[in-house]
Amino acid sequence: MVKSNLQRILNSHCFAREKEGKKQCESSIMEALSSSITDRMASPTVCCSSTTGPGPLWCSDAPHPPLKIPGGRGNGARDHPSTTQTLYSDRKLTVTEEPAGPGRPQILHFQSRPAAARLIQWEAVLRGDGLFVEIPCEPFPDGSKESFISLLEFAEEHLKVVSVFVCFYKNREDRVKLVRTFSFLGFEMVKPGHALVPARPDVLFMAYNFDRDSSDED
């Protein structure tokens, strides 16, 4: 259960801001994730997409393009398409969605404002029982702990997903720190061949699995 671990997580320093410096990565994996998941939805037995798109395909050897998603890091807002709809909103969290359509899965945008002047956003792809969350390239801003916990609570209570996956490139300089951070939060490394995870050897996935039996009892 997310709430049972909330105090322990909020008391941690896992999401402490690092010193500003060299960016840890140069591109977003959200478009690649969307492309891969769409391909798996269309053909579960094939992990490589044959369609072209703005980002690298999951099984492509092409270099990562400089398509970092602005926003989601407390320093701006992404320009969402006109099809974006508000899915949920309260004092802590606002969730908007880009509905699934031909060639693309459902994309969710999580926005929270832990402090009056700080907007934190997370980008995610929803597919079946899994929510895939992109980890930003920049250091986590103040308030990221509370913001991410709100995301987990929403995923558990409203989306009713079985697992939340965080994903980031394996060649990031802060890879060890990210693995340690999310391991502390209860995430586990995903082994190759997982039914919900695209076959992308250069991307690392970690999963948080909800205890649905305990959730139903509550």
UniProtKB/Swiss-Prot annotation:
Pfam families: ODC_AZ. GO terms for cellular component: cytoplasm; nucleus. Expressed ubiquitously in 24 hours embryos, with highest levels in telencephalon, lens, retina, cerebellum and hindbrain primordia. GO terms for molecular function: ornithine decarboxylase inhibitor activity. Transmembrane segments: none annotated. Ornithine decarboxylase (ODC) antizyme protein that negatively regulates ODC activity and intracellular polyamine biosynthesis and uptake in response to increased intracellular polyamine levels. Binds to ODC monomers, inhibiting the assembly of the functional ODC homodimers. Does not target the ODC monomers for degradation, which allows a protein synthesis-independent restoration of ODC activity. Interacts with ODC1 and thereby sterically blocks ODC homodimerization. Belongs to the ODC antizyme family. PANTHER family: ORNITHINE DECARBOXYLASE ANTIZYME, ORNITHINE DECARBOXYLASE ANTIZYME 2. This is Ornithine decarboxylase antizyme 2. It comes from Danio rerio. The gene is oaz1b.
